[in-house]
A protein has these predicted regions:
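NAD(P)-cofactor binding segment of oxidoreductase domains
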Residues: 62-112, 122-130
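Mid/C-terminal beta-alpha module of Rossmann-like enzyme folds, strongest
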Residues: 193, 197-219
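N-terminal Rossmann-fold cofactor-binding loop
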Residues: 30-35, 48-49
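Conserved beta-loop-beta element that borders a ligand/cofactor-binding pocket
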Residues: 128-150
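Rossmann-fold cofactor-recognition segment
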Residues: 41-51, 71-73
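N-terminal Rossmann NAD(P)H-binding glycine-rich loop of SDR-like oxidoreductase domains
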Residues: 3-23
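Glycine-rich "substrate-gating" loop/helix at the edge of Rossmann-like oxidoreductase active sites
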Residues: 144-153, 173-185, 209-211
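A conserved pocket-lining segment of Rossmann-fold NAD(P)-dependent short-chain dehydrogenase/reductase
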Residues: 162-182, 194, 206
């Protein structure tokens, strides 16, 4: 398959690109060109996705079997991309977030649980709603907290920094809040697994590790 990845040079995109190339797919990245491709020989189309006219100019005429939209935060990010390829792409995989769910004491969250319209990830919800209303063969991925090598967010690095400097680790609340983590390689593998899977079309999937932990347990 010829596959377009929006981004592809930071964290999740690095491992997704590597796995898709290993599986024999022809991968094309679209990004600003600020970082090298994670795999040599991968084609890179340079542009700014926040400029719809430039996006159309750069991508119109290209043919892709599948698209991974890893960095669309708002509907305005993703809609122009969908409008270009909605009549031709076989599978559009959208990176959403497990942060869209309404706070609940019933854990773990299931895909059908209530969502929070005031979530800071509202743009993700708007995009999912838009994709559902379009004639687009899409799958939405909702990952939990992702960790692993080359993480550009100071998540695990923050903890290790305090540990090596013998600094205390503050624990929110009473320490019994439940959270769940997922390794970046497992997320990339899950994203790859939806390709050529007809049952994944127009579906939403939570992706996380198998175990949960309290903040006390994490500390």
């Amino acid at each position: 398959m010829r596959i377009l990845i929006m981004g592809g040079t930071r964290f999740i995109g690095i491992y997704l690109t590597q796995q898709l190339v290993e599986q024999g797919h022809k991968v094309v990245l679209f990004n600003r060109g600020n970082r090298p491709a994670p795999v040599s020989g991968v084609e890179v189309i340079t542009g700014d996705r926040t400029n719809p006219e430039q996006l159309k100019q750069k991508l119109q005429g290209e043919k892709f079997d599948a698209i991974f939209d890893n960095n669309g935060r708002e509907l305005t990010d993703t809609q122009p991309l969908v409008e270009i390829f909605q009549d031709s792409v076989q599978h559009f995989v959208y990176m959403s977030s497990a942060g869209v769910y309404l706070k609940s004491d019933q854990m773990p969250h299931r895909e059908g649980d209530a969502v929070d319209p005031k979530s800071r990830h509202k743009g993700k919800l708007d995009t999912e709603d838009y994709l559902m209303k379009q004639n687009v063969p899409f799958t939405s991925i909702r990952p939990t907290y992702i960790y692993g090598p080359q993480n550009y967010n100071d998540l695990e690095a923050w903890f290790f920094d305090r540990i090596v400097r013998n600094r205390p680790i503050p624990i929110p609340g009473n320490g019994m809040h439940i959270t769940q983590f997922g390794h970046v390689k497992d997320l990339a593998n899950a994203m790859c697994s939806v390709l050529n899977n007809s049952s994944a079309i127009r579906q939403t999937y939570n992706v996380s590790g198998e175990r949960f932990v309290t903040f006390d347990g994490l500390a």
